[in-house]
């Protein structure tokens, strides 16, 4: 507990106090890394407004947190808070996090500015019982801190752990090898590393499918092809903290031919969204997602994968999936109206109602369940289905109650009957600021946090609200879209306060939640 408390507090103080080029510490990054993230501590500290009064209050509280867990350490902690360079680590250079191929190890990399000061810091931690005694071998100094290995030399600092729980000391030779390696033998000499640098994000994350164990890749690719190379299926996410919003962009860097062909065939089965479903729900709807598909092409694309094809062919419910998919052509949307109770409705533009015959064909089979399942007509092209225990069909245990059918040219599927006939009184989603951005996108999703808080406050008393809602109450909405022109995924998390950087607002929130 003392170790965890120290590193949580220390990480926060380092980030908050960071305000010189030098040794080539990036050469330590393993060449076979399957994921690499970089954090611009200097830029984030400036955006957090730590030079103002709120920032100073946050720093003092975090320093107090450290002091409470480490006795007789007040002087050193005060020196580090006053001057981060006293830690011996650079808080002006980027911090790196990495994960090796197949997740055999994960680590943090920082630049060392003063090896002696870093040694003093670790000696103090050793006296506090936080880490073991320092040892020197293979050209580096190292120690063990719980399940983590710390190793460093005059250029670089490594904190390494094995997600599977391997003994920390067993990783010393790998860490020493990375600390000794030349730049040409590291991840820093790859095109993917350059992509991270070119992105210039406050936080940038590069990852490939090689991050996953072999046993996890097959289900994700659904048995698509043995020719797929996981290390060539990769993406880069860039996050920036801006005034009033957090912005994240994700783009594919995939070069694997198998996956590129899969993606191309998927895009051939989809098209830009028309936005026809925006008028179906009020402006304060909690959550909504949409895309536009050619159902017949999508079904063909799905069936090109052997695992998915088997799933359709051996479904526990004998439906004509080809007929259902082929009826869909146009916008498809999924709406969550009440997040606390999970109320939802799926809508899809259809060109025919003929596919409902496959539902009628189920009636003899359902009649043989002795009332365990019931399928009832509720008007023209309208059905109600009830099942006493969903686990019979590998669904969640307990009663399952849904309504589905076709109405006004749209197929619907919902767990709340009143959503079928719901009318919009007043402004619809189309009248919102974000509603004007939907048309033409490949995918568009929105989460309305103002609506969420209205639902929560009308359902729960203030004393019943989890602490997380204190933060959520400061949010406006989150939108996620895939643009037609570059197929890049763009996400924005908007705060209610549009006049301050979101990191500065987070600093104020820390003061609020930790205040006495």
Regions of interest found by a model, annotated:
Residues 296-298, 354-355, 419-422:
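Flexible loop/turn segments at secondary-structure boundaries
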Residues 492-493, 501-506, 514-516:
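C-terminal "exit" segments of structured domains
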Residues 1-17:
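Sec-dependent bacterial lipoprotein signal peptides
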Residues 112-116, 163-166, 351-354, 416-419:
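Helix N-cap motif at beta-to-alpha junctions
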Residues 55-61, 65-93, 125-243, 314-318, ...:
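An internal, short helix-loop-strand segment that often contains or flanks glycine-aspartate motifs
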Residues 342-350:
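Terminal, regulation- and interaction-focused segments at domain boundaries
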């Amino acid at each position: 507990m003392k170790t965890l408390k120290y590193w949580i507090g220390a990480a926060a103080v380092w980030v908050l106090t960071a305000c010189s080029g030098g040794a080539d510490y990036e050469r330590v990054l393993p060449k076979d890394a399957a994921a690499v993230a970089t954090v611009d501590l200097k830029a984030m500290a400036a955006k957090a407004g730590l030079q103002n009064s709120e920032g100073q209050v946050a720093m003092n509280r975090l320093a107090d947190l450290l002091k409470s867990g480490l006795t007789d350490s007040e002087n050193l902690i005060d020196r580090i808070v006053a001057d981060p360079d006293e830690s011996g680590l650079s808080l002006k250079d980027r911090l790196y996090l990495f994960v090796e191929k197949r997740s055999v190890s994960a680590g943090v990399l920082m630049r060392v500015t003063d090896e002696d000061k870093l040694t003093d810091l670790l000696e103090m931690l050793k006296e506090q019982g936080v880490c073991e005694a320092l040892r020197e071998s293979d050209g580096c100094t190292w120690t063990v801190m719980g399940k983590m290995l710390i190793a460093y030399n005059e250029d670089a600092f490594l904190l390494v752990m094995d997600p599977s729980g391997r003994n920390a000391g067993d990783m010393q030779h790998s860490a020493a090898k990375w600390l000794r390696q030349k730049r040409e033998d590291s991840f820093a000499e790859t095109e993917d590393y350059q992509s991270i640098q070119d992105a210039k994000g406050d936080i940038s994350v590069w990852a490939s499918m090689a991050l996953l164990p072999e046993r996890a890749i097959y289900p994700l690719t659904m048995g698509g092809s043995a020719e797929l190379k996981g290390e060539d299926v990769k993406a880069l996410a860039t996050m920036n903290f801006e005034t009033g919003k957090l912005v994240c962009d994700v783009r594919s860097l995939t070069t694997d031919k198998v996956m590129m062909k899969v993606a191309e065939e998927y895009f051939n089965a989809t098209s830009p969204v028309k936005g026809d479903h925006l008028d179906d729900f009020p402006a304060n709807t909690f959550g909504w997602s949409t895309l536009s598909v050619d159902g017949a092409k999508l079904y063909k694309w799905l069936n090109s994968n052997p695992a998915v094809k088997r799933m359709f062919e051996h479904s526990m419910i004998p439906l004509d999936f080809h007929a259902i998919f082929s009826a869909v052509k146009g916008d498809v949307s999924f709406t969550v109206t009440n997040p606390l109770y999970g109320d939802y409705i799926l809508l899809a533009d259809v060109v025919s109602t003929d596919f409902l015959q496959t539902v009628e064909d189920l009636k003899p089979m359902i009649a043989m369940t002795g009332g365990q399942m019931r399928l009832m007509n509720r008007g023209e092209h309208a059905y109600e289905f009830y099942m006493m225990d969903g686990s019979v069909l590998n669904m969640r245990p307990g009663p399952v109650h849904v309504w589905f059918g076709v109405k006004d040219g749209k197929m619907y599927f919902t767990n709340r009957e009143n959503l079928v006939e719901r009318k919009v009184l007043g402004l619809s989603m189309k009248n919102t600021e974000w509603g004007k951005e939907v048309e033409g996108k490949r995918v568009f999703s929105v989460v309305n946090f103002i609506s969420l808080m209205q639902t929560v406050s009308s359902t729960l008393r203030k004393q019943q609200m989890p602490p997380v809602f204190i933060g959520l109450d400061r949010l406006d909405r989150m939108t996620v879209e895939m643009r037609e022109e570059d197929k890049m995924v763009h996400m924005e998390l908007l705060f209610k306060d549009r006049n301050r950087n979101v990191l500065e607002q987070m600093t104020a929130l820390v003061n609020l939640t930790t205040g006495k």
